[in-house]
Amino acid sequence: MASLKLWVCLVLLLVLELTSVHECRPLVAEERFSGSSRLKKIRRELFERLKEMKGRSEGEETILGNTLDSKRLSPGGPDPRHH
């Protein structure tokens, strides 16, 4: 009886997977490329985006500088009675 329930579940999952509709947009707008040229184009786009993001992050660092570094010193060292 348990094996029958298992088979029914597996068949239902298989039917659901085969009949489900996946709607997603393609990574690349043009779909007429072959497999290898499509991968090359995707890789090139990813590298361009990575360079752009690195440029942005480096620009933010130069704008902020070291303003986030704390230059505060404890007046008498760490408090031994703290905690």
Curated annotation (Swiss-Prot):
GO terms for cellular component: apoplast. Residues 53-83 are annotated as: Disordered. GO terms for biological process: cell-cell signaling involved in cell fate commitment. Keywords: Coiled coil, Developmental protein, Differentiation, Glycoprotein, Hydroxylation, Secreted, Signal. Glycans are attached at P78. It comes from the Eukaryota. GO terms for molecular function: receptor serine/threonine kinase binding. The modification Hydroxyproline is found at P75, P78. Residues 1-24 form the signal peptide. Residues 38-58 form a coiled coil. InterPro entries: CLE1-4 (IPR039616). Belongs to the CLV3/ESR signal peptide family. This is CLAVATA3/ESR (CLE)-related protein 3. It comes from Arabidopsis thaliana (Mouse-ear cress).
